[in-house]
Design a protein with these regions (language model features):
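Short, flexible helix-loop junctions that flank or precede catalytic/ligand sites
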Residues: 1-378
Length: 378
């Protein structure tokens, strides 16, 4: 497959994905091109791609530097913006000796907090002068999208300097009321470490530092918050409790007392998100858990009593907090998601089922037993 032919083929696939409101395109050997729409992967051609096809498609969208990195490490992350098509985040890799790629759509229009339907308290969180805000979720849960919406709100509503350090840069933020500096690792800076070390010399008000994967990155995040900046990052976990446990486990036992004190003083919010299929079949809805670092939460973190935080969140809705199960109840009550999907994504199936049975107005018109026979009591 020639480069021009490969480039046209991949662009046609990307256009098709956008027309179907897909989120991800999968290119892999011995399997047809496939795309994910509303969380479900479907083939878009009966003909499987061979190893030569996948190699040609990957090389067609890489520049020389990316191709050299891929040749050396067998991994490469980058973003592309084919003219007239859109912007996409790409992860290229080798599997069983063949090239594979996953290409994710980056929406052309910046998302907004109102447009995403996420809680309004996020507007207050992102306007904080200082502190650490962590967005939590699994891969594909919409963390980056919500984070982009929060950054855009800050960009519109304040005057300052926003720095983002990403690999790759996903959403491109124009300068509005803020100066926005976006640095891509490998393109604008040699490493995360170098970019993070130098960011404090650039007079930032907000630092968005992408995903926290290890202790060193977490230390930078806490240091930024301690020095009077608003630091925002993402973390792979399923809930606020799990995220705190994961952060604690980044550090050796002898450093955890200091870590817990640092988190109790500097954490601003923990925002956990999942995407649930909408009841009408048109896309997915963001269901969000929010933990805010109130004095009571701060005290629990300082003591290491992470398991007790969920109960405080349940009782603090007046402050803007909510658990996943409370958010699922609201989404069910608003006819946004089905009863089955609410239970399927619940932290405690039994608690949510009981809450719906006792407090839901919608439940009176729904057969709550239908389709839920396989759900375990937790």
């Amino acid at each position: 497959m020639e480069r021009d032919q490969a480039s046209k083929f991949i662009n046609d696939l990307l256009r098709l994905m956008i027309s179907r409101n897909g989120s991800d395109l999968f290119i892999t050997g011995e399997f047809p091109p496939a795309m994910k729409v509303d969380g479900k992967v479907t083939k878009v051609s009966p003909q499987p791609l061979n190893a030569g096809h996948t190699m040609a498609l990957a090389r067609a969208i890489m520049n020389d530097k990316q191709a050299a990195e891929f040749e050396r490490t067998k991994e490469c992350n980058f973003a592309i913006s084919p003219p007239g098509v859109g912007r996409f985040r790409v992860n290229a890799f080798i599997q069983q000796g063949k090239v594979g790629m996953v290409m994710r759509v980056i929406p052309a229009v910046l998302p907004t907090i109102d447009g995403l339907g996420v809680p309004q308290v996020l507007k207050e969180v992102v306007m904080s002068k200082r502190g650490l805000t962590i967005l939590v979720g699994s891969t594909g849960s919409g963390k980056s999208t919500t984070l982009a919406a929060m950054v855009d709100w800050r960009n519109e509503q304040s005057y300052g300097h926003i720095i983002t350090i990403e690999d790759p840069v996903e959403f491109v933020h124009p300068h509005k009321n803020c100066v926005v500096t976006q640095r891509e690792v490998g393109l604008d800076t040699d490493s995360w470490e170098a970019a993070l070390k130098n960011s404090l010399r650039q007079a930032p008000d907000v630092i968005l530092m992408g995903e926290v994967r290890d202790r060193e990155t977490m230390e930078h995040a806490i240091a930024f918050a301690e020095t009077g900046h608003l630091c925002m990052c993402t973390l792979h976990a399923n809930s606020a409790n799990q995220a705190l446990d994961r952060i604690i486990n980044f550090f050796p036992e002898e450093r955890r007392t200091q870590l817990l004190m640092d988190l109790s003083l500097n954490l601003k919010a923990m925002v956990s998100q999942r995407l649930i299929p909408k009841q009408d079949g048109k896309g997915r809805a963001a269901v969000v858990e929010i933990m805010l670092n109130t004095p009571l939460i701060s005290d629990l973190i300082f003591k290491g009593d992470v398991s007790e935080i969920k109960e405080i969140m349940k009782k603090s809705r007046n402050l803007g907090m909510q658990t996943f199960d409370q958010a699922l109840f609201d989404a069910f009550e608003a006819h946004t998601i089905t009863y089955e999907d609410a239970l399927r994504n619940a932290d405690s199936v039994n608690d949510l089922r009981l809450q719906i049975k006792l407090n839901s107005k919608r439940a009176k018109s729904v057969d709550l037993a239908a389709g839920t026979e396989d759900f375990a009591i937790v």
